[in-house]
């Protein structure tokens, strides 16, 4: 199959999509964005066309090299294997395990508990409290872990997959008005990452589907 420009099905505010956008930017991969609005039309992810593409009806979804990949960490790992520069997983097995541990903690242990589909089930009056509790519980653990793994970034002094997970999750925390004062390590790493070009161009405020009032 002829492989053209990669296509990323993404929602500007999706933290999972943001992880992949950062990876694509870091690796210098040119791609086309197809916006999937998770709110408009009762959720465009529920359309028959998108469900045929991704049976889980979630973003991100990436078409690349003639295949379709779902789930942000699986996408990033594929990009790492096929386009390994710059490296997002350390060569050292112990550091690589730390990167995967932190990535899984965020992608599997924090974000799913406060995502849109869960908050809809909680009920409007409880959404903010629920999200704050989920993020705070996860950040309590993450702050402690980072104190032993961090250098300039989450694991040592090079940007890794863990950092791609951290920044979008801090943005979620800020959106849900979580007090970040108890998390100085998380906050300082996040601040250092946000000045990097790949994190800026992939930011939710600079996407094709970003509403005008949220653009920067």
From Swiss-Prot:
Residues 4-87 form the GST N-terminal domain. Pfam families: GST_C_3, GST_N_2. One of its GO terms (cellular component) is mitochondrial matrix. Pathway: Amino-acid degradation; L-phenylalanine degradation; acetoacetate and fumarate from L-phenylalanine: step 5/6. Its cofactor is glutathione. Changing residue 150 to V: In MAAID; decreased maleylacetoacetate isomerase activity. Belongs to the GST superfamily. Zeta family. Bifunctional enzyme showing minimal glutathione-conjugating activity with ethacrynic acid and 7-chloro-4-nitrobenz-2-oxa-1,3-diazole and maleylacetoacetate isomerase activity. Also has low glutathione peroxidase activity with T-butyl and cumene hydroperoxides. Is able to catalyze the glutathione dependent oxygenation of dichloroacetic acid to glyoxylic acid. This is Maleylacetoacetate isomerase. The gene is GSTZ1.
């Amino acid at each position: 199959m002829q492989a053209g420009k990669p296509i990323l099905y993404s929602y500007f505010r999706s933290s999972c999509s943001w992880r992949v956008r950062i990876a694509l930017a870091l690796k210098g991969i040119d791609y086309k964005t197809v916006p999937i609005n998770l709110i408009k039309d009762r959720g465009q992810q529920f359309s028959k066309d998108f469900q045929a593409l991704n049976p889980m009806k979630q973003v991100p979804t990436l078409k690349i090299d003639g295949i379709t990949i779902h789930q942000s960490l699986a996408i990033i790992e594929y990009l790492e294997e096929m386009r390994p520069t710059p490296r997002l997983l350390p060569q050292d097995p112990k550091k690589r395990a730390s990167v995967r541990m932190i990535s899984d903690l965020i992608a599997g242990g924090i974000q799913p508990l406060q995502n849109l589909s869960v908050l809809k089930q909680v009920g409007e009056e409880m959404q903010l409290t629920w999200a704050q509790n989920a993020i705070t519980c996860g950040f309590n653990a993450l702050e402690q872990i980072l104190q032993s793994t961090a250098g300039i970034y989450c694991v040592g002094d090079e940007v890794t997959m863990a950092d791609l997970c951290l920044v979008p999750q801090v943005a979620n925390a800020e959106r849900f008005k979580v007090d970040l004062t108890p998390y100085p390590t998380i906050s300082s790493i996040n601040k250092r990452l946000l000045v990097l070009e790949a994190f800026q161009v992939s930011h939710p405020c600079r996407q094709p589907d970003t509403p005008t009032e949220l653009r920067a």
